[in-house]
Structure formats: C-alpha cells, structure tokens
C-alpha cells in the first residue's frame, strides 16, 4: 500500500495523497498543542523505522512525460569490490552492499556488482516554499524555492517531521518521474528563484541534486541544499561546484544524542561544516531544540565555542522550537525561554546572527546589524519578510557588511 506524504515545516502541514491528486489541510497554529488525536484525524498512516545494511506544483499539474527515464541510474561515489560486492562512499556509513542488497538508506541497490540509485528523478514530494521556511535567513530574503524530495535518509531521527518520506523505501511511496530539466522548468513556471533539495536527506539523492542544480544554473536558477550534513568529502565537493547555499542540521553538540536519537555520529557533521567553510559555500546551521534531550546549557556553550573556533562568528544559527512528533510525542513543546537562552549564550560568545525559530512573530526571527543593532531584515508571521534595510549587502544605517547571499 502506498503511503501519504507529510511535509511539515513550522506552522504548515501538507498531506499529499498517494494517487494523482493532492490535497492540503491546515493544522492548528503551532501556538496550540497538537494532540495525537488531531494528527491521526488527518488520515496519515504510521510508518515504522526499518534500518537495513501526480502532485501539483504551484497549482499546475506536474506531467510525468518529461523525458526522464524510469530505468535506475548508476550511482556515483562507490567502488566495486570482489564477489560482486560494492562499497558506497556517498556518506560516512560507507556501506558494503552484497549483490541484491541495499545500503542503510534503502535508496542505493547493488545489482550484479553495480550500484544503482533507486531515487534518481523519483520526486516523492514537491512544493513552492519561501526560502525562509528552509530556513535560510541570509539567502535572497523573500524569494521562493521550488522544493523537491525523494524517499530515504541516512539517519533515523526519532523526532523526524517528515518521517514518511525519510523512513520509507522508494517503492513504498507514490512518486513522479522528473528529469533535471523538468525540475528547472517547473521552478521557472512557479516563479521560483531557487531549487531546494529538502524534506528528506539530499545526500541519498546526491546525483539527482547535482544534476538539477547544474540544469538550473543553465537557466539562471540557483540551488540550495537542506541536509543533516552526514556526507562524505567527494560528493560534498562536487555539490559545492553548483549550489548557492547549504543548510546543516546541527542536531546537538552531544555525541550521545547523535548516536541514540539520530542513529548517526556527530564528528562527520562537524567535518562537513568545516569543509563547507573551506569550500566557500554559504552555510547556515539549525538546531531543533528538544526538551530534556539537547537543551543543556553546557552543550550550548560547547556548540558556541566550537563554532567560534572552527567557522567563525558570521555563520547564522537557528534555534527552532520542537513540537511532539513521530517517536517523541511524549515530550513537551520547547519553552520559548529555552530558545532565548540558547540565543543569548551564542551571542554572548560572539556569534553575530542567532535566531529563534518556529515561534511566529518573535523578534528573534529578524536580522539585526551587529554594528549598530538596528533591525535590517524584518520578519513577521508565516515566513513574511517586511522592510529590508540593506544596500548592496551592507547595513543601510551604518554601512557595515552583512554576510550572506544577497544577489545571484
């Protein structure tokens, strides 16, 4: 049975039917508690975590006759071993996969000693979002991003908002077949300035993400990646050639949290953040702050010191509010005071741009000049951007340079 797709970001939830039509339903505002009863009332089936070694775009029908092939595409970033074994090198798991088997992400399959991507061009969800929803606050404020996702992930986060995408096998989801050129055409048609690879983990569809970004550039549309940062150096360096920005979920400073709550490791994510800095790719960090699990002030301090020491004070950091979801429905919503305290800790240690997220209307969602303290990018409810007091990447009040991607 094919599954419904749930796309969750802050206040919006989109329920995508597994058939050819789609519908959207709106959850109560995040200021209200979302009960399990309300969640189940949306008609979304549950998905189990299994770890083993046509939609509409901006109101337009997305055609599947895009010239894209239904034949699985050979993966990049792997090596052939003896006895028809292969080793995938797209992420730090470096899965060794036997003939007929799949890697941890369940999107890469060994067929007779050749590794294939099962999700190349298989778009399981697409939507047009404000770039602030990703969130990117220093990338083309107020712009739109044509957002795409496939099945699969190389983590199994217990709090995943989009678990029905990330924890599903490709064959369990209804998807449409799109070529990179078709993705670009849909981005243009929707009025989007960007293509965003998001919702699930783009690392598992690195080949498609790269090709979409390259095709987009040829038409003047740039791409951004929304990722957990669990990616090896070679694919990251390849992506850096064609993307405008990369958002990393800095899920915690605790190694234990990574191991027990995400199923991954912390240090490879830290290496990705440092590597992005060296590659010159604009990077923003997001910390989903979960009560009792990663809201320890000592960890905030360690995170702040690491950021200052390794990537510097200019990287934006977003502390976003957790809402009970997936396997962590027993936990409460994050108190706003916790997010504010985290923001204070990082700013006290010299990080210039620290944001409070998932709290619509909070002043901590706006951008303030580190020179004069004035509000230079005003943000309100629903990802809206108000007045922008900047000129050519500088503060309109005092002239100090504000780091970011302000034009392309």
Regions flagged by a language model, labelled:
Residues 16, 21-30, 59-87, 93-149, ...:
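N-terminal [4Fe-4S]-dependent radical SAM core
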Residues 22-47:
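N-terminal secretory signal peptides and thylakoid transit peptides that target proteins
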Residues 88, 157, 369, 395-398:
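Short cysteine-rich clusters marking metal-coordination/redox-active sites
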Residues 110-245:
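Conserved Radical SAM active-site core
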Residues 166-167, 202-204, 229-236, 246-263, ...:
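Conserved radical SAM core fold
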Residues 188-215, 257-270, 287-302, 308:
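Conserved glycine-rich "GG(E/T)P / GGGxP" loop and the immediately following alpha-helix
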Residues 267-328, 339-355:
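Conserved C-terminal portion of the radical SAM core fold
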Residues 382-390:
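Short linker/helix segments within small regulatory modules
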């Amino acid at each position: 049975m094919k599954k419904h797709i749930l796309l969750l970001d802050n206040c919006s939830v989109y329920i995508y039917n597994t058939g050819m039509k789609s519908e959207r339903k709106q959850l109560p505002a995040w200021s209200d508690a979302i009960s399990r009863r309300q969640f189940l009332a949306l008609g979304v089936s549950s998905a189990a975590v299994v770890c083993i070694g046509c939609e509409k775009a901006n109101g337009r029908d997305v055609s599947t006759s895009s010239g894209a092939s239904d034949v699985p595409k050979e993966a990049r970033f792997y090596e052939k071993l003896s006895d028809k074994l292969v080793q995938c090198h797209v992420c730090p798991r470096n899965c060794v996969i036997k003939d007929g088997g799949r890697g941890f992400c369940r999107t890469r399959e060994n067929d007779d000693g050749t590794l294939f991507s099962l999700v190349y061009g298989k778009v399981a969800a697409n939507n047009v979002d404000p770039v602030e929803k990703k969130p990117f606050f220093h990338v083309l404020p107020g712009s739109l991003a044509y957002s795409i996702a496939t099945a699969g992930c190389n983590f199994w986060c217990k709090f995943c908002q989009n678990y029905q995408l990330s924890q599903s096998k490709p064959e369990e989801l209804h998807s449409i077949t799109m070529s990179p050129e078709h993705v670009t055409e849909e981005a243009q048609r929707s009025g989007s300035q960007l293509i965003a690879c998001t919702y699930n983990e783009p690392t598992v569809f690195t080949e498609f993400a790269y090709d979409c970004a390259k095709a987009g550039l040829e038409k003047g549309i740039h791409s951004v990646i929304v990722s957990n940062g669990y990616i090896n150096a070679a694919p990251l360096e390849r992506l850096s050639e064609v993307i405008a920005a990369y958002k990393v979920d800095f899920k915690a400073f605790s190694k234990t949290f990574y191991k027990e709550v995400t199923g991954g490791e912390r240090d490879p994510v830290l290496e990705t953040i440092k590597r992005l800095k060296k590659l010159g790719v604009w990077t923003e960090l997001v910390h989903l702050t979960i009560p009792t699990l990663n809201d320890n002030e000592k960890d905030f301090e360690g995170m702040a010191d690491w950021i200052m020491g390794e990537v510097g004070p200019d990287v934006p950091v977003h502390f976003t509010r957790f809402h009970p979801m997936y396997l962590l429905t027993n936990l409460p919503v994050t108190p706003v005071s916790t997010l504010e305290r985290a923001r204070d800790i990082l700013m006290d240690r010299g990080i210039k741009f620290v944001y409070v997220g998932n709290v619509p209307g909070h002043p901590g969602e706006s951008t303030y000049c580190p020179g004069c303290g004035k509000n230079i990018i005003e943000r309100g409810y629903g990802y809206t951007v108000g007045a922008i007091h900047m000129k050519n990447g500088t503060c309109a009040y005092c002239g100090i340079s504000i780091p970011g991607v302000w034009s392309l």
